[in-house]
């Protein structure tokens, strides 16, 4: 039997990246959630070739302190929690501290960031987990991540990616879900130099629905706004005239986090079963506000189940 040995940190990060980053859409999700946690009111997502050659995400959030930049790319480095007890009440979208180290281990990454108090910004380039550049530059407040050549050093994993069009579709779905869950943030999505999504950030969910799904959907909605001592439910459901042959029209959020729940889906679909044809599913965009102490967001790797 071969001698047992301890893996080097870069190899550990590449293995771990497989659990966090499986395609370009995973990178977009993680970096958009970072931007939201940083207090951004504007997020721009630009991709080329389905995100395989370029992902650029720019926000106007608080930026990253100079002394924290290199630390942020270490595995399990996070500002969101300090101990396991903090998982009980964590409200941020990200908290595990795995995303940046995972992305940097399998991509070529350039970070440009500036905080409000800093005189200059910082550019940090890291490729395959190895530092290339760390320098001061002029930059606006906020953060830009430029991610190139996903899986450039793990070609076997790159072969499992779909076509550029399919990968772009996965990214578009992520951007749509985040835009629906945060109508107070202006979000734009640019695919191969063409703007596909742009929301104003005016806080009006119906405007976001119109922007993503179009006039026919937006004009056939019923508003939901109800609450009790445990939960507040807001959003929109579609009239019977709009339905689809799969659940892609169903959007559910808990405290602004997109989730998948067979229990919620089944309950909503049961309410429609006498007004929709068989094998048709309704449009929904519903947010549930619940006491954070009653939730466990750490039960699913992608944090999509609670």
Residue ranges: model-predicted function:
Residues 1-306:
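N-terminal phosphate-binding caps/lids of nucleotide- and nucleic-acid-binding domains
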